[in-house]
Amino acid sequence: MNDKPQKFTEKRKASIGEGLEQLPGANDERFVTIFEHGSLLVEVYAPQGTDPQKPHTRDEAYIVARGTGEFVNGETRVSFEAGDFLFAAAGEAHRFENFTEDFAVWVLFYGPEGGEKQ
């Protein structure tokens, strides 16, 4: 684990490995911010055991980097694997369940508070 997380605000490339090297964080965080530009915030997220996240104030896209499991979004439950894309609109209750120990996702927060409206 690195003592000082690095954000790749000036780089044009980051790898899942670079994010995972910074986890867990100093306070046992399971996510790390690796890129910011305008409204876009990119994180690597790798929960262990359970996924404690709560609804977020911005739209959120996930790209599964590794592992398998189930994504629960409201009343909808879907299986996922590496390479899959998942989406949760701002304010929607969502979580990962039954995921493998190696599970990790790219997280992309974007747009205004309250999410984009169609």
Residues covered by each model-derived region:
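Short acidic-glycine-tyrosine-enriched beta hairpin
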Residues: 75-90
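Short hydrophobic/aromatic-rich beta-strand segments that constitute the beta-sheet cores
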Residues: 42-43, 71-73
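Short strand-coil-strand connectors
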Residues: 36, 72-76, 99
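Short, conserved beta-strand element in jelly-roll/cupin
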Residues: 56-71
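A short, N-terminal "cap"/entry segment at the start of jelly-roll beta-barrel domains
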Residues: 1-44, 49-54
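Ligand-binding loop in jelly-roll beta-barrel domains
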Residues: 90-116
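A structure-centric signal for secondary-structure junctions around beta-strands
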Residues: 39, 58, 102-103
